[in-house]
């Protein structure tokens, strides 16, 4: 199931209900790809005017677990060069050096996407790959 760029256009109660409905209709073992902005703190302080509520990493991860999803993978998507610079400046020397080398080889448009992948909590956008456990009934 693909669920992308939608949950942020709903009130958080409705977004949570939509996730429950996804869980209900998924077959056991099925996966869902869920992407959305990552906005820690007050989700009503949105990055984009068209959005109603933007879930933060911890909040969304907890809600997915509460519903019953198993998290298969978490991926950071899209971040700005400035944010990546700030983030990597605080890391261990080897990681800082790796980032500095990558900046010299990779165009900024690709760098921001590539370097955000392993750090979903810090990324501007999230991709959660979740699964309905194989032992669950279809109408759980």
Positions of predicted regions on the chain:
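Conserved SAM-binding loop
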Residues: 1-43, 61, 128-132
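Short, solvent-exposed loop/helix junctions and linker helices
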Residues: 12, 54, 120-121
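Generic alpha-helical secondary structure signal
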Residues: 13, 58, 93-96
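A SAM-dependent methyltransferase catalytic signature shared across enzymes that methylate proteins
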Residues: 60-78, 105
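Short "lid" loop at the C-terminus of a central beta-strand within the Rossmann-like core
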Residues: 37-42, 54, 77-80
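A C-terminal cap/extension of S-adenosyl-L-methionine-dependent methyltransferases
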Residues: 76-140
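Acceptor-substrate binding/catalytic loop of class I
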Residues: 44-59
């Amino acid at each position: 199931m693909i669920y992308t760029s939608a949950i942020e256009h709903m009130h958080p109660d409705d977004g949570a209900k939509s996730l429950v409905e996804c869980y209900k209709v998924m077959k056991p073992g099925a996966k869902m790809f869920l992407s959305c902005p990552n906005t820690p703190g007050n989700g009503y302080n949105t990055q984009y005017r068209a959005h109603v509520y933007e879930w933060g990493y911890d909040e969304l991860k907890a809600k997915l677990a509460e519903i019953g999803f198993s998290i298969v993978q978490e991926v950071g998507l899209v971040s700005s060069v400035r944010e990546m610079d700030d983030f990597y400046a605080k890391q261990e020397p080897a990681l800082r050096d790796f980032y500095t080398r990558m900046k010299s080889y990779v165009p900024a448009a690709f760098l921001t996407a590539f370097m955000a992948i392993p750090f979903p909590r810090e990324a501007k956008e999230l991709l959660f790959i979740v699964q309905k456990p194989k032992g669950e009934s279809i109408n759980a």
